[in-house]
Amino acid sequence: MKELDQILEKCAEEIDPLSHEIAERIRKLKNLPKDEMFLEYLRIIDFTSTTKIPWRKKNYILIILWKYGEKIERLLYSRLEHFGRANVPKRYFRLVDGKILSMLFLVFILFPAFTSHIWSFRLGYEEIQVGKEITFNENLCEYRTAWLYDFKASMVCTIKYGYGKVNIRLNSTNPMEAGVEVQRFISQIPYDYARLESGFSYIQTPRETIGRRIGVCSDFAILTAQVLLDNNVSPVYIIHTLFKGDITGGHATAALFINGTLWIFDWGSAPVTFSEYLDTIDRLWEVREVRVYRLTESSIVLDRVYKGEPESDAWRYVYTLTMLIGIFIIKRREWLWI
């Protein structure tokens, strides 16, 4: 067959510069019957793969033999596929596809949502009885900047020493009724979200809060405590809650002990028990510590502290590990080098 001889000659010509011996063996195949010639061609490939020659040269020869072997096979045996390339659908490389997006949704949405409910402040905290009085030099209270950003000093200067005091008369001295009345009053004052977002959590006196008609939680807590104490509702409690990663100073609200239950009177909400308050705030933020201050007209005492158990952040690294493993599993067939 003339076409077959041409294929063998071209193959020999390409291999000759690399190995004259192999090229001559290929030329001799022209004189053999087609079946014997094909088997001998396969033997030449096997001989080349096992011969000790430089690997780069060996690879070049094998590539040439494979290329022309495919042509010979198609010419002689259309049904054989020793050399023929498998008919595999072409895969297009896509960095992001539906599977990747689904995995990212699981890793960064569902998984964090689930794990965030595993740890809860209510499920593990330590109650520490403190009973330590909070003090601050009265002479320093005359300098507003000395306690502008200090919540504890602000309580001492405004509640104990009366700086920035307001005179508001309530309609009742009943603790619950008085607490509800003050709560409704402070809830009518707009919340200063701009100051909260800015991170500059300075403390206002009750007079400043009333005069400016705006404030944040610490301002409303101090105002509520001062008004209640001024109306002979005593003692008043201030609950200071600290959150993980919060730079604004946490959240403060006033409270009263009524019939053995601590009731919270927070801005913009109805009265709730301390337990209900913790349940609500624990769902919104990661609570790290709750400080309970006991206030009278003559003293500010850190009564007790509820301290959350330390939470390990080691499990958060599962995000990255899961993502890398997921990408490897999903994309391994497209990334041919894996």
Curated annotation (Swiss-Prot):
Membrane topology type: Single-pass membrane protein
Family to which the UniProt record says this protein belongs: Belongs to the UPF0252 family.
InterPro entries: Transglutaminase-like_domain (IPR007562)
Spans traversing the lipid bilayer: 100-120
Name of the protein described by the UniProt record: UPF0252 protein PF1496
Chief location: membrane
An annotated GO cellular component: membrane
Keyword annotations: Membrane, Transmembrane, Transmembrane helix
Compartments reported by the entry: Membrane
Signal peptide: none
Keyword Transmembrane helix: yes
Domain of life: Archaea
Thylakoid keyword on record: no
